[in-house]
Swiss-Prot record:
Pfam families the record matches: NAP
Gene3D superfamilies: 1.20.5.1500, Nucleosome assembly protein
Gene it is expressed from: spr-2
Protein name in UniProt: Suppressor of presenilin-2
Compartments where located: Nucleus
Expression sites (tissue/organ): Widely expressed.
Protein source organism: Caenorhabditis elegans
Record keywords: Nucleus, Repressor, Transcription, Transcription regulation
InterPro entries listed in its UniProt record: NAP-like_sf, NAP_family
Length: 312
């Protein structure tokens, strides 16, 4: 959050006092020439930074309507920001369990950089009704380019016995509620820096990440490496976006369903085969019964034709 260093001013021979006694004249002249070249490079770097800033200002304005589209979606997802905070590998350490319900009331989070992108930014938080305070919107403003950098915060209307005590070290906040309440100097506000430069830039990657308390450290590192686009050895790898991940899940689900359907179809065919075999068995029994009945009729007929056999 600190200002960029200014370009160095070109030195002259009088500003190299040590060289007068320790370095020969030709070497001293070359060093002075080198310093003049370095001055030109510093000026060019400063000019380049100004041009980059102008481009960044243009694209910062172009991002605004896209952020608005994102906002319309995130506000419709229950506990979106709470989940993103709790899954963040740094921010989650500042959120004790008893403060998680406050984050559940965080309906929207917005970062607004000042127009010149250098003088500061705001973090604007919109809350649903909660047990801590009556404010709907709380804003923290960070002013960076004045002679004495400062932080301004909305006056919070606390409910009874809900205001947290002032941080023991009097400098930095250790919990989210302390950070929300007290104004630390901009250059020591790590929570604000992480929110601005990481969480707000891409909250979705943390929303879909598994619960930080339920995953191993190696799994976290693997996930973060994938988001950075590198493998465990630091080599670049193709980055798979969230929609691709969701598509893979859907494909796996479809494959699983297809497998279940095939299994059910096989079972159905086996049942049909069993029914057919059972029917064939019944038909055989019926044929046997008919044959037996036919045999009895033949015997009776034979007896009727030869009555002497009966007399005997």
């Amino acid at each position: 959050m600190s200002e960029e260093p200014a370009a160095k001013r070109m030195k002259n021979a009088d500003e190299f006092p040590n060289l007068r006694s320790e370095v020969a004249g030709p070497v001293k002249e070359k060093l002075i020439e080198l310093d003049a070249i370095q001055h030109q490079l510093d000026v060019m770097s400063e000019n380049a930074a100004e041009e980059v800033l102008k481009v960044e200002q243009i694209f910062n304005q172009k991002r605004l309507p896209i952020y608005e589209k994102r906002k319309k979606l995130t506000t419709k997802i229950d506990n979106f920001w709470q989940t993103a905070f709790l899954n963040h590998h740094l921010l989650s350490t500042a959120i004790p369990e008893e403060q998680e319900d406050l984050l559940a009331a965080l309906r929207d989070l917005e970062v607004q950089e000042f127009e010149d992108l250098r003088s500061g930014f705001k973090i604007i938080m919109t809350f649903d009704p909660n047990e801590y305070f009556t404010n709907e919107v709380i804003t923290k403003s960070y002013h960076l380019q004045s002679e004495s950098p400062s932080t301004e915060i909305t006056e919070i209307e606390w409910k009874e016995n809900k205001k947290p005590p002032f941080p023991e070290d009097g400098d930095s906040a250790h919990t989210f509620l302390e950070w929300l309440t007290y104004a630390a100097l901009p250059d020591s506000d790590e929570i604000a820096e992480v929110i601005k430069d990481d969480l707000y830039v891409n909250p979705l990657q943390y929303y879909v990440m598994p619960d930080m308390q339920e995953v191993e450290e190696d799994d976290i590192e693997d996930f973060l490496n994938e988001e950075r686009g590198v493998d465990e050895n630091g080599q670049r790898i193709p980055r798979r976006n969230i929609s691709d991940s969701l598509k893979v899940d859907q494909d796996e689900s479809a494959d699983g369903q297809e497998g279940e359907d095939e299994e059910e179809e096989d079972m159905g065919e086996e049942e049909e085969d069993g029914v057919e075999e059972e029917a064939e068995g019944e038909e055989e029994e019926e044929d046997g019964a008919i044959e037996e009945e036919g045999g009895d009729e033949n015997v009776e007929a034979h007896v009727a034709v030869n009555p002497e056999n009966t007399a005997e």
